[in-house]
Amino acid sequence: MSDVPGEDSPTHFYPVNFENYLRPKQSIKCQPLQRFKKPNERATNLYRNLKRLKILRWYNRVSKRFEEFPLPKFLGFLQARNDDGLCKRKTGFEIYCEMASIHGFHIFVGAKTWQRILWWLLICNAVLLSFTLVIMSLSMSKETPTIRFIDTMMKPTAEVPFPAVTICGFNTKEWMNSSQIVNQRNASWLELLEDLALPICPQIKICQWDNRMVNCLDQLQPIWTLDQRLCCSFNYNKQLFSSYLGVSFVLRSNDEILQSSKSAGFEVLIHESHEIPNGATPRVFVPGESDAHIMLRPYINRFTKNLKGLSLQKRGCYFSTERRLILSDVYNQINCLAECRTESILKSCGCIPPKSPIEKSWLICDLKQMQCVIDFDHDEIISGEQKNCDCLPPCEFNRYEFQSDIRFIKGMINNSIVNTSNQETTNEVRVRVYYDSAIAEELLLDVYENWLTFIGTFGGITGLFMGCSFVSVFELIFFSCVRPTCNWLTRQQILWRRRRNQRVGITESRSLGPAN
């Protein structure tokens, strides 16, 4: 046959190999494919240069060697087809590659062997890298199951509980016969602490809350700190809210109960309302005859509902009512450590120091057991270790940072919170505690990765390296499960029809046989 067909030469048609369930039911709708002759195009300069340099010849030689290269049986799909793709029946894998939305799979159809091998290596590397990154993401989520981030920086301070303000003094009572009391061994350790402690609440003459003209002296209560100091606290074990005006105090020391210095001053401790202050509580020293402004900046720490699905070991914190304490119903790490220390002293000495967290059945140490308590604290300091008793931090708490502005009031005019009558201002201390801003910063504790973020991470990684999506998964399920099942059912239906037609033909032949 000549290359150019004549006028009477028949036209070449190529039938289309449909699947059985895709074959047209009407023969009129069957459109044969006609192979047209490719027109001779004019060769470009690039083609001539490549041909002159024998690059095309080398390319064809290497490509032919790749086609003749023996591949394992499981890599047979990488072998290029030897036909034009119309006469040879396509496999299900080839049909999937033609229709797949994953990048690079269409190269497996119609490309040469070396191109298929190259793309197969690239796809394998992409799959390996994507699964490596997914495993790394899961390992990071396992190592750090929680994350804390800033939820908002515009939280109104009017919705933040005001902290407890505890005032402690440095002065002590002048007991001339205190050594006699100790030598007589008649007074207990508890009685000695109570007798030598200087009350602070009677020295607070004026207390105004939120700049109202309501006296808040009745809300003051004496408390003992964990380092056995008698102080006076405002808003202890309560929950008050203030926008920015805060609380104001005026303290006047009594000269009769001071040992020597009239201007020793006070300490102002800022802490949460359900927390017992200790030696590490943030504080401000306010000297005598001074006016102190303490400006608070709260930081709210909350948690999401997703955190309740994690175990205690993974989240690393306690909920407010998850662990019961002796001191308060709300969990606090400082109170938990104080109870842990008390229980350790009880096991070591058989008693606990006075004014410590105590159960009703526990004994209070006397002066004879004081040395045992001192030795316990000394050994703990030397070892540098402290039993934590699983005292994890709380999941929800408020942290208060503050700045202070202290000025001496000598020669100053009494302000509105001080009586204007002619009273001596000796040893007078004015303290005002308030929020420095109407907004606060709120931090949120959440799980590092849940099922929704994992889907986003997995989809982003696989989409970046392979171009996969949910449509790709549905395609894979369809071509691996649905399509083979439909083909099998279609073949079974065809076989059943053939058997039925054969039985009908045999029955008709038997019925017509005797009649003839």
From Swiss-Prot:
Its main location: membrane. One of its GO terms (molecular function) is sodium channel activity. Expressed in embryonic and larval tracheal systems in the dorsal trunk and transverse connective (TC), but not in the junction between the dorsal trunk and TC, and in several tracheal branches and terminal cells. In larvae, also expressed in ventral pits. Expressed in the taste-sensing terminal organ of the larval head. In adult, expressed in hairs on the tibia, femur, tarsi of the leg and wing margin. Keywords: Ion channel, Ion transport, Membrane, Sodium, Sodium channel, Sodium transport, Transmembrane, Transmembrane helix, Transport. GO terms for biological process: liquid clearance, open tracheal system; regulation of synaptic activity; response to salt stress; salt aversion; sensory perception of salty taste; sodium ion transmembrane transport; sodium ion transport. Pfam families: ASC. Disulfide bonds: none annotated. Gene3D superfamilies: Acid-sensing ion channel domain, YojJ-like. It is a multi-pass membrane protein. The chain crosses the membrane at residues 117-137, 454-474. It is found in: Membrane. One of its GO terms (cellular component) is membrane. Belongs to the amiloride-sensitive sodium channel (TC 1.A.6) family. Part of a complex that plays a role in tracheal liquid clearance. In both larvae and adults, contributes to the behavioral response to salt. Probable role in sodium transport. This is Pickpocket protein 11. It comes from Drosophila melanogaster (Fruit fly). The lineage of its organism: Eukaryota, Metazoa, Ecdysozoa, Arthropoda, Hexapoda.
